[in-house]
């Protein structure tokens, strides 16, 4: 009998200690712990988590502090200033140039200082803490028709403080510019721990402050700012690129422009805007007041196609005359990769043959008619006959006088228009698919971010593109060209193997020569991603010795001992040092993989695949999707896919004390992964942490043996038949008072959980008792093998009976094959030999039947995915002696039950009563990972149900995970996120295809019913 206890706090990660290993500098730890309320973590594993960001760099920090307030930040900086210890403020760790890794005490501002403090819709402003995500800020102000204008690619996972530190922008910078324009005021902590507020201030007041006390830190800062405005104006005018997209160096041009009255009253500057782009080197921003903009009423998109990338580049400047909100480019490499992606294959297929690149042009408009007119004007001006090419037919009608706006040769071959939200989103998703496609490469050669961010005046893009291509060719490599063509920011990531010394030398040569071209063409070394380790060394070449000296003087005024994120912006970083993968990097897993890894570099390629973007850290409310449920429940870096990848790579590369099987902390970290597979589809790189977890657990079992609880849970398919034979006796342990405590003490089964109830009449018993198939084979339209998964067969035969009723109503001949299960339970416990044996038996039984024309249909989603996907890992290649062709035959002809009904439109062949009920649908994470979750929704809607599909993550039960005592708190914390979504839904009832999900949902409230499987609802609607 379950013991009722209060639900855990969603921030509670359970019984896991988030620190481990040796703690260096205990005196420093003790001193900081006395001074702050937040956590102080200087152990090996915590430092490992913060040694990387989304860049190619890796630097082990001194330690990590999770401040809870500005007072905590001030206390840390005051002490470290006195002791000469560097400090690094950090947000989401999404930096692409290495700004957020350093040998310093890291301040993780996203842990506790992450609130949207207030909003003022009338003034269109908001007050936020630095650790608040941009996505959370937008969610708070969206009901008022407002948003934070800069839209960095990872805005749901990027902190506002990080956006300020980087001076972030995004795809729509043509319309909105950079973050500095929207920072009205900032609370900052200076290097010595002084807390002050930066905002608008008269330059004359700065002069008075500087004269009043020349020895104090703040007056010295004021004095240096005044000196720069007085003495460096001409140099700033001469050396700063005349571009909106420049975030290299310090924001002195903005300061000078304000002083001159270009943004308001002359003689007044806003020091908060000097923080923009300073990368935490001048002060730590703890709070900020930011201005907001209205969400555009209407959007319209045109996709222009070109025969050559240079034609597209030539066309950018003329297109800007039409005042677009965004102009984005994709080259032929990315278009080819997108064509191989099912989601975009049809879009690419509609492009004219020979298309080498496309420009996505988006307009903001006052209404549909205005949007269509803007697109029509663009098409009339830019698409047409050049080089004897006939003008394409188009339904667009340009306004009078719109044609030949630019008097430039028309270069676009074809145009596709998108005015409805769905098609616009598809075009944008295709453009944004570029980075995930590039990052999914598992070879040692990777598309490295180091010179991807230069900003060039649009009229010089063709020359820049040609020269860049020549530089790449000289260095024996290539790159893709994509992203923000409108403001002149092409994301170009050369293919480099940083493990090879020659490639690193080529990387430096490319950066050096490209920087020369950038300076000559009047551009910036960084138009978006900042300086950091990758580009700081090129700022001197960009700005010259005099301004470089002024940068250093300003840095010294703010930070006399250079303790705030030292090395960045104007320091001595060398881009070829501190690379995550270098010539000294070593890979030794300590075990051979037990599964097939059909990717380049095998399991090593997967271990090294995470590039650190932080996509796994997105909140459910703003990010959606499945990844990563344990992070969302605990908000701990180590519980994110990125954290686990860092731990695993650290153990394998020797940066942590032991290999994965010998390091108990790493084993525990992997054990807390729920195996949802969300990262396989939601992670831009496609990191398959569930598969890596299975490998690590299997290797651990091989070395240390399998404990009793793991063996019992992993052998559930073998034990369940006995449980049903002994029912109801076998169900007594779940009903006797006090039995839960005994089970927890003896086996580690959470006392709060109700154990599965075994049915004395199994699905197979029922099927045989009714005489087997209800539709004769010779009269059937289809033949189905209903796979007897363990959950449907022994604990929930009702769903299986419903499946039989539905399939037979659609005139299917149904049989239940003689197999003992899919092997999912042992697989989820890392018992891969046992899982492989079950998979082999299933394939050997099913393959001949499928070859004779029968389809395999599975009620339980996780078992369906086992056959469709995981069998390849267990049986393909050298993993087993089962022919790959047999595995493929089974996998390609296996369906989830609702998938099968939808794929063959069986519901349209069934007489259904029109239901009036509305349903809240929670899909199974494994189906979402294989993009098969939509089938049930479509079928139920066609059947007449109203369906609200939740954009939910894992339920938290995750098979046996939620039954394990040490995981109960985490399981319920994950579940609480789902429960809140259910509570907000308007459905009359909840449906869920997963047995574990239904168990978790039943426990959301006292007396809550166990939700049915969707097929049960479909069966209930049978006439």
Task: List each model region and its residues.
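Short Gly/Ser/Thr- and Asp/Glu-enriched loop/turn motifs at secondary-structure junctions
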Residues: 44-45, 102, 354-358, 422, ...
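Short beta-alpha connecting loops at secondary-structure transitions
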Residues: 115, 121-126, 298-302, 449-451, ...
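Noncatalytic alpha-helical scaffold of FAD-dependent oxidoreductases
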Residues: 1-90, 94-481, 490-527, 537-622, ...
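Iron-sulfur cluster-binding electron-transfer modules in prokaryotic oxidoreductases
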Residues: 559, 691, 695-1023
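Ferredoxin-type iron-sulfur electron-transfer modules in oxidoreductases and energy-metabolism complexes
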Residues: 582-613, 617-720, 836-842, 888, ...
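Non-catalytic terminal/interface segments that mediate subunit docking, oligomerization
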Residues: 418, 432-481, 505-509, 609-657, ...
């Amino acid at each position: 009998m379950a013991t009722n206890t209060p639900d855990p706090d969603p921030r509670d990660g359970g019984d896991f200690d988030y620190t481990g290993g040796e703690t260096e500098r205990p005196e420093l730890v003790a001193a900081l712990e006395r001074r702050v309320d937040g956590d102080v973590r200087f152990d090996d594993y915590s430092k490992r988590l913060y040694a990387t960001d989304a860049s190619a760099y890796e630097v082990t920090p001194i330690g990590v502090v999770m401040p809870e307030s500005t007072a905590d930040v001030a206390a840390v900086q005051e002490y470290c200033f006195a002791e000469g210890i560097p400090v690094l403020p950090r947000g989401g760790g999404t930096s692409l140039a290495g700004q957020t890794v350093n040998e310093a005490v890291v301040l993780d501002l996203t842990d506790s200082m992450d609130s949207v403090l207030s909003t003022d819709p009338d003034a269109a402003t908001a007050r936020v803490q630095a650790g608040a995500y941009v996505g959370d800020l937008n969610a708070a102000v969206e009901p008022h028709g407002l948003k934070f204008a800069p839209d960095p690619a990872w805005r749901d996972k990027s902190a506002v403080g990080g956006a300020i530190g980087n001076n972030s922008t995004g795809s729509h910078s043509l319309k909105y510019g950079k973050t500095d324009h929207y920072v009205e005021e900032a609370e900052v902590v200076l290097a010595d721990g002084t807390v002050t507020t930066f905002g608008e201030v008269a330059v004359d007041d700065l002069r008075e402050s500087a004269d009043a006390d020349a020895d104090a830190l703040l007056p010295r800062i004021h004095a240096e700012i005044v000196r720069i405005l007085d003495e460096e104006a001409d140099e700033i005018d001469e050396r700063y690129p005349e571009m909106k997209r420049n975030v290299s160096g310090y924001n002195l041009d903005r300061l000078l422009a304000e002083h001159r009255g270009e943004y308001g009253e002359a003689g007044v500057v806003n020091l908060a805007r000097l923080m923009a782009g300073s990368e935490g080197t001048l002060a730590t921003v703890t709070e900020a007041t930011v201005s907001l903009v209205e969400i555009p009423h209407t959007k319209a998109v045109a996709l222009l196609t070109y025969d050559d990338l240079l034609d597209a580049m030539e066309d950018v400047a003329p297109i800007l005359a039409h005042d677009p909100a965004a102009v984005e480019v994709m080259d032929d490499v990315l278009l080819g990769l997108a064509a191989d992606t099912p989601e975009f294959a049809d879009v690419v297929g509609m492009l004219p043959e020979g298309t080498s690149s496309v420009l996505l042009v988006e307009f903001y408009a006052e209404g549909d008619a205005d949007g269509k007119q803007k697109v029509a004007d663009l098409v009339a001006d830019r698409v047409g006959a050049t080089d004897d090419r006939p003008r394409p037919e188009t339904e667009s009608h340009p306004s009078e006088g719109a044609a030949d706006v630019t008097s430039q040769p028309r270069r676009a071959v074809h145009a596709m228009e998108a005015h409805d939200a769905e098609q616009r989103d598809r075009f944008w998703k295709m453009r944004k698919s570029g980075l995930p496609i590039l990052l999914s490469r598992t070879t040692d050669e990777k598309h490295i971010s180091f010179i991807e961010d230069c900003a060039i005046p649009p009229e010089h893009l063709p020359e820049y593109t040609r020269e860049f291509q020549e530089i790449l060719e000289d260095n024996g490599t290539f790159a893709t060209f994509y992203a923000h063509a409108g403001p002149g920011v092409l994301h170009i990531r050369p293919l480099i193997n940083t493990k090879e010394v020659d490639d690193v030398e080529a990387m430096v040569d490319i950066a050096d020569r490209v920087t020369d071209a950038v300076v000559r063409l009047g551009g910036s070394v960084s138009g978006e991603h900042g300086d950091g380790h990758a580009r700081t060394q090129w700022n001197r070449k960009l700005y010259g010795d005099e301004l470089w000296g002024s940068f250093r003087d300003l840095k010294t005024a703010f930070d006399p001992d250079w303790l705030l994120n030292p090395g960045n912006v104007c320091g001595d970083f060398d881009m070829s040092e501190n690379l995550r993968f270098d010539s000294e990097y070593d890979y030794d897993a300590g075990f051979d993989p037990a599964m097939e890894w059909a990717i380049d570099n095998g399991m090593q390629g997967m271990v090294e695949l995470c590039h650190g973007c932080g996509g796994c850290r997105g909140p459910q409310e703003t990010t959606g999707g499945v990844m990563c449920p344990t992070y969302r429940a605990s908000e701990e870096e180590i519980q994110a896919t990125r954290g686990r990848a860092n731990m695993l790579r650290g153990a394998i590369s020797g940066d942590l004390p032991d290999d994965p099987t010998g390091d108990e902390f790493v084993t525990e970290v992997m054990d807390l992964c729920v195996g949802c597979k969300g990262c396989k589809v939601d992670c831009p790189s496609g990191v398959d942490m569930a598969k890596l977890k299975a490998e690590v657990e299997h290797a651990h079992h091989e070395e240390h043996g399998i404990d009793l609880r793991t063996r019992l849970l992993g052998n559930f398919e073998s034990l369940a038949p006995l449980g049903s034979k002994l029912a109801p006796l076998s169900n007594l342990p779940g009903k006797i008072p006090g039995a839960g405590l005994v089970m927890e003490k003896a086996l580690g089964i959470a006392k709060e959980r109700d154990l599965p109830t075994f049915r004395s009449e199994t699905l197979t018993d029922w099927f045989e008792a009714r005489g087997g198939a209800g539709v004769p084979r010779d009269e059937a339209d289809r033949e189905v093998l209903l796979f007897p998964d363990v959950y449907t067969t022994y604990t929930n035969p009702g769903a299986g009976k419903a499946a039989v009723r539905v399939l037979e109503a659609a005139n299917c001949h149904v049989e239940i094959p003689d197999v003992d299960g899919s092997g999912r339970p042992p697989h989820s416990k890392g018992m891969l030999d046992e899982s492989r044996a079950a998979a082999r038996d299933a394939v050997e039984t099913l393959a001949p039947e499928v070859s004779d024309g029968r389809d395999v249909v599975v009620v339980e989603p996780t078992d369906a995915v086992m056959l469709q996907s995981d069998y390849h890992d267990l049986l393909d290649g050298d993993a087993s002696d089962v022919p790959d062709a047999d595995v493929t035959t089974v996998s390609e002809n296996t369906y989830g039950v609702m998938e099968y009904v939808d794929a063959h439109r069986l519901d349209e062949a069934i007489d259904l009563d029109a239901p009036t009920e509305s349903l809240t649908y929670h899909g199974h994470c494994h189906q979402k990972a294989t993009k098969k979750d939509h089938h049930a929704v479509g079928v139920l809607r066609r059947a007449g149900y109203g369906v609200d599909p939740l954009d939910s993550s894992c339920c938290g039960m995750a098979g046996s995970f939620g039954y394990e005592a040490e995981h109960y708190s985490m399981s319920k914390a994950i579940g609480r996120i789902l429960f809140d979504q259910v509570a907000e839904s308007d459905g009359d009832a909840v449906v869920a295809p997963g047995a574990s999900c239904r168990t978790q949902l039943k426990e959301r409230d006292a007396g809550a019913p166990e939700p049915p499987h969707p097929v049960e609802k479909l069966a209930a609607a049978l006439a």
